[in-house]
UniProtKB/Swiss-Prot annotation:
Task of the protein: Required for maturation of 30S ribosomal subunits.
Cellular component GO terms, alphabetical: cytosol
The protein's name in its UniProt record: Ribosome maturation factor RimP
Subcellular compartments: Cytoplasm
Keyword Transport annotated: no
Amino acid sequence: MTVSREEISTILDDALFLPVKLYSLKVNQRPNHSLIEVVLDNLEHPYGSVSLLECEQVSRKLKEELERISPDLDFTLKVSSAGAERKLHLPEDIDRFRGIPVRLVFRSGESEKNQEGIFRIVNRDGDQVFLEKFQKGKKSAVKKQTTLNLKDILKGNLYVSI
């Protein structure tokens, strides 16, 4: 017995409560077993972190509903937070995480190789993203500003400085 990704997504729509939303869903179906991985996001937390209690509540609701609609389903369920160094969903996360350090991989007209850097998102105007180079612990230093076109940003993650 299997359950589809769409069925799980529908159950999650009912199980989730704002400010918690679905970040990603992976369903790996095997002939006799399913691995269901749910990753959550908290829209009100500065880094999107979800509490253990929130993960537990969603896990419990999803498990109960899966057992109700498909009692013979053999599955492993993993519910977690997207994490402090989560992958950015572009372009919407550019606005959401303004002011927070991010690690970006981007194309630069000056080089054939992809570039990488740690920046703070200052602002976005259409496809232009205004950044300043992140300098750990240097509050009064002159901030080096740069501008990237959104299409040149290949990937990004939140960056946690310890």
